[in-house]
């Protein structure tokens, strides 16, 4: 087991303000050889007095990063992107052979096929991926311990994730800020993911309306799930899961007792 108690309570990718974070930079020229870095190289200030006022200047910043990432495939173990992720930058990031942790806040990256190159990846957050067309490439990441996918509007079936036998934490949710639900066919895939210790499932609609696969999560310690008529009917049975101790199911019974 990899996840610690703090990660089980709050989520592996929860941001604590008092914790040290990697340095945040914009341009390749600011890089000082760190293995962990935050790169915010898009959505740059385009005002008239900015060095990035032209589209060409802004594009050059992204191009330089793409070139650097491809030509230096062994430098990073952790990368965070808090500004818009375009497809070409996503593909370049997937050149990083030693990457163990990747956090993408949001972007337009419909093709994630190259992520299967990141065989050492353990922690993956793909935010606001409404254009993503397939999650099959993620199923190749056999060392994944924790996965968050947000707003994958085109994905109806999450069965490919059952290949991730080391996965302890799984978050599947829509756009919680809009808010906008995602719709998936079923959560039957959970019956083959009994190793999960953390499962969060918000702003999501299950077309089958069958939530009984939740009862197969015999190792679950944190369970946070959107209330619904079907979930509420199962609430007492869910509480009997042998290792359950965190999440809205435990901390917010009023959500499910309406």
Predicted regions and their residues:
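Concave beta-strand-loop units of leucine-rich repeat
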Residues: 3-112, 120-189, 195-258
